[in-house]
Amino acid sequence: MDALEEESFALSFSSASDAEFDAVVGYLEDIIMDDEFQLLQRNFMDKYYLEFEDTEENKLTYTPIFNEYISLVEKYIEEQLLQRIPGFNMAAFTTTLQHHKDEVAGDIFDMLLTFTDFLAFKEMFLDYRAEKEGRGLDLSSGLVVTSLCKSSSVSASQNNLRH
């Protein structure tokens, strides 16, 4: 095989594996955005969010929760992917993901990171707890409403007549 044939073969192999990777990521997006997955994850977080505290110390109780989450969510996602891609191999995909992590949308990668990175998992729970307790990110102080009318003397009733 000469150099040109090798390059062509490598390109077609690369393109096929890239297309396969892109297809899996597309399916992952569909699965993660699906109401069934959202409900599964929300129910799990509702069950355990009060266990998590925003401290440097990680409680021993976090470990079984983390393991249960991995088992539940990873199993669900793998089953969904197997329905869409017969013969799908999660371990092989995870390896490929490490090489393509810059190409994956942030929210997808962050969610996948919760399977392997305990701190990402804990942060997800802390964010959820803050949201449940009304301590979520408040952007209202940064919002300013400005009238688009040139004259501020136009009354509300006159303004309504214009629309």
Curated annotation (Swiss-Prot):
Interacts with GTP bound ARL2 and ARL3; the complex ARL2-ARL2BP as well as ARL2BP alone, binds to SLC25A4/ANT1. Interaction with ARL2 may be required for cilia basal body localization. Interacts with STAT3; interaction is enhanced with ARL2. Found in a complex with ARL2BP, ARL2 and SLC25A6. Found in a complex with ARL2, ARL2BP and SLC25A4. Interacts with STAT2, STAT3 and STAT4. Keywords: Cell projection, Cilium, Cytoplasm, Cytoskeleton, Mitochondrion, Nucleus. Disulfide bonds: none annotated. This is ADP-ribosylation factor-like protein 2-binding protein. The keyword Protein biosynthesis does not apply. It is found in: Cytoplasm; Mitochondrion intermembrane space; Cytoplasm, Cytoskeleton, Microtubule organizing center, Centrosome; Nucleus. Gene3D superfamilies: ADP-ribosylation factor-like 2-binding protein, domain (1.20.1520.10). One of its GO terms (cellular component) is mitochondrial intermembrane space. Belongs to the ARL2BP family. The lineage of its organism: Eukaryota, Metazoa, Chordata, Craniata, Vertebrata. PANTHER family: ADP-RIBOSYLATION FACTOR-LIKE PROTEIN 2-BINDING PROTEIN. Pfam families: ARL2_Bind_BART. It comes from Macaca fascicularis.
